[in-house]
């Protein structure tokens, strides 16, 4: 009983982790407009297509670094301040006849890339896998194919940028699906603790009747036990997709960021066929 409760707790924590992670990512990704204080806007990283030149911020907007005269050094200097260890410069943004003063953080390309990564993660879809046999008609010791529609298996990108005196500094972050995983309960008693796992590179292969029963797939799992012993009569599993995160920037710098996984729960009913003796 303790093992069963532990398995249920692990699956529940996984679901909560996915939910909280999605809310957290959406909150961070939507925080690109910042806030305002004393009539001045505090801005985060800008989202979308960057300007094509140092002064253009779209078809009718311009960004200008604001300066002030410093008597101590005898010439003008840009207006800046440090908040939580990050230095912000004050820019004037003009769009037609309207303008606003906006504090823009000084960030390295990798920091802008991480902001874009938050946007990408918020856009990644939860996987929807197919199974053969179907989840309601699986059989012990009979291989199960699982796969993702190839049209779903495509990269997802986002671009973030900040204005600088040298023109916009942008970073483009791309998440590329690389691995499909399947984790499931697979125990023979109502209190057992056996678990099953399989993974493969790529989206897997779609099963077709013309392939026959002896064909193999890189994405395949074979249940060892029937699910009839479970109180619900089924096994709970998780299908996941691992995404590789990479980025490029306007400076030529680029690299990779920690991979990310999207997941979804699946329910499988596994029967055990009894041989007939004549």
Label for each model-derived stretch:
Residues 1-12, 26:
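N-terminal export and membrane-targeting signals
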Residues 24-278:
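Extracellular/lumenal mature domains of secreted and surface-exposed proteins
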Residues 9-21:
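Bacterial N-terminal signal peptides
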């Amino acid at each position: 009983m303790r093992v069963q409760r532990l398995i249920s707790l692990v699956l529940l924590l996984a679901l909560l982790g996915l939910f909280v992670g999605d809310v957290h990512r959406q909150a961070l990704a939507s925080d690109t407009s910042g806030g305002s204080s004393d009539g001045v806007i505090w801005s985060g990283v800008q989202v979308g297509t960057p300007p094509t030149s140092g002064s253009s911020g779209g078809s009718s907007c311009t960004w200008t670094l604001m300066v002030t005269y410093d008597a101590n050094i005898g010439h003008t200097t840009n207006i800046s301040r440090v908040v939580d260890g990050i230095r912000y410069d004050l820019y004037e943004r003009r769009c037609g006849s309207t303008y606003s003063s906006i504090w823009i953080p000084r960030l390295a390309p990798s920091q802008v890339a991480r902001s874009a990564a938050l946007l990408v993660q918020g856009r990644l879809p939860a996987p929807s896998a197919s199974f053969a046999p179907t989840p309601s008609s699986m059989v012990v010791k009979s291989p199960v194919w699982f796969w993702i529609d190839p049209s779903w298996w495509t990269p997802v990108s986002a671009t973030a940028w900040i204005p600088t005196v040298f023109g916009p500094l942008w970073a483009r972050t791309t998440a590329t699906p690389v691995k499909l995983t399947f984790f499931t309960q697979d125990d023979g008693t109502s209190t057992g603790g056996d678990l099953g796992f399989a993974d493969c590179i790529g989206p897997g292969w779609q099963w077709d009747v013309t392939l026959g029963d002896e064909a193999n797939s890189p994405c395949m799992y074979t249940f060892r036990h029937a699910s009839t012993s479970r109180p619900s009569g089924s096994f709970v599993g998780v299908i996941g997709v691992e995404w590789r995160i990479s980025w490029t920037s306007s400076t030529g710098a680029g690299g990779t960021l920690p991979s990310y996984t999207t997941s979804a729960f699946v329910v499988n009913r596994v029967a055990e066929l009894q041989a007939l003796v004549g």
